[in-house]
UniProtKB/Swiss-Prot annotation:
The PRC barrel domain binds ribosomal protein uS19. The keyword Nucleotide-binding does not apply. This is Ribosome maturation factor RimM. It comes from Staphylococcus aureus (strain bovine RF122 / ET3-1). HAMAP family: Ribosome_mat_RimM. It holds the Pfam family PRC_RimM. Belongs to the RimM family. One of its GO terms (molecular function) is ribosome binding. An accessory protein needed during the final step in the assembly of 30S ribosomal subunit, possibly for assembly of the head region. Essential for efficient processing of 16S rRNA. May be needed both before and after RbfA during the maturation of 16S rRNA. It has affinity for free ribosomal 30S subunits but not for 70S ribosomes. It comes from the Bacteria. Binds ribosomal protein uS19.
Length: 167
């Protein structure tokens, strides 16, 4: 199974570099030189090997092997990028999850009252923050004091909200 790891938002320069908005975790591994990515363009799967990777202004700047000119890559703007989910270089620790497993889960408080659904995840220096869309939009820190149970099979998360977290 493959997961979407980003989207090509634009090109950069004339030597075939692309700007990628990542919607994935483990970008330090996924975008390493030598990694194979699949770009889906007009319902066609195009495989590319990463030649270089750097981060600039919050975007991932990639070049692919064999692409040395803007004309070879410009037509891919707006295309989604995928990689195999069970990437051999990624080892999940206990209580560590793929973003794709968490996004879409329904979040409940410890009284089983539904709060909303996870729609996005932000990385911060200390911990990830989950964006929950319910009657309002909530920002929930992924810390042990708040997140009590994650059941990815049933797409269910139980939290114990800190005071003021859901106000």
């Amino acid at each position: 199974m493959r997961v979407e790891v980003g989207q090509i938002v634009n090109t950069h320069g004339i030597k075939g570099e692309i700007k990628v908005k990542s919607n994935s975790d483990f970008t330090d591994v996924r975008f390493q030189p030598g990694q194979v990515l699949t770009v889906v363009h007009n319902n066609n799967d195009l495989e590319y090997t990463v030649k270089s990777h750097r981060v600039h202004k919050g975007l991932h700047m990639l070049t692919f092997e064999g692409i040395n000119n803007i004309n070879d890559i410009e037509h891919l703007k707006g295309s989604s990028i995928y990689q195999e989910r069970d990437h051999e270089d990624i080892v999940l620790e206990e209580n560590e999850y793929y973003y794709s497993d968490i996004i879409g889960c329904t979040v409940f408080d410890d009284q089983e009252t539904p709060i909303g659904r996870v729609i996005n995840i932000f990385e911060t220096g200390a911990n990830d923050v989950w964006v929950i869309k319910g009657s309002k939009e909530y920002l929930i820190p992924y810390i042990a004091d708040v997140v009590k149970e994650v059941d990815v099979e049933n797409k269910k998360i139980i939290i114990t909200p800190m005071e003021g977290l859901l106000d």
